[in-house]
Amino acid sequence: ARFEITNRCTYTVWAASVPVGGGVQLNPGQSWSVDVPAGTKGARVWARTGCNFDGSGRGGCQTGDCGGVLDCKAYGAPPNTLAEYGLNGFNNLDFFDISLVDGFNVPMDFSPTSNGCTRGISCTADINGQCPSELKTQGGCNNPCTVFKTDQYCCNSGSCGPTDYSRFFKQRCPDAYSYPKDDPPSTFTCNGGTDYRVVFCP
């Protein structure tokens, strides 16, 4: 599957794609194409902001940092708006979602572009600007689990319900996962072999 990752923000982001892709700097208007093998699971695409890297690709980012390297091998540090997917899973379906379980840093659209699959997801609200003060952080809005680390928000025991904080995210981005046990409608499917695009600041 081909993933086209485009930065429509007015500022530079450092896109990340794991486990396939790594990371690149995307200036406003730039795109990056990643070819992802069939069967790839547990995959994420996200934007990093406020980064500084040296010539060898070492440094760090204000949001979404993946261990201080440009070429990500690991997931990013919250807060980061996540495009998550698994390809060719049950019944050869692709499963994809936008998740705010690790908080929000950059608005995002995640949509299929082929195979007759048309239902995409977007999360474009001004979550950073409206973020509750206790969740605010440099460059983003944290999920309460990151801040409070309690079972109520993190669902470590496997069962938990929505909270005022998760509703804050859900009201602004109804198609995105707002907490770990959020409703299944937050996950979307296409037939295997579909191509996708991720747009930052759509």
Curated annotation (Swiss-Prot):
- Which Cys-Cys disulphide bridges does the record give? 9-201, 51-61, 66-72, 117-190, 123-173, 131-141, 145-154, 155-160
**Which of UniProt's keywords are assigned here?**
Disulfide bond
Note the superkingdom of the native organism: Eukaryota
Sorted alphabetically, which SUPFAM superfamilies does this protein's record hold?
Answer: Osmotin, thaumatin-like protein
**Any one of the GO BP annotations:** defense response
The entry sums up its family as follows: Belongs to the thaumatin family.
The molecule here is called: Protein P21
Q: Which organism is it from?
A: Glycine max
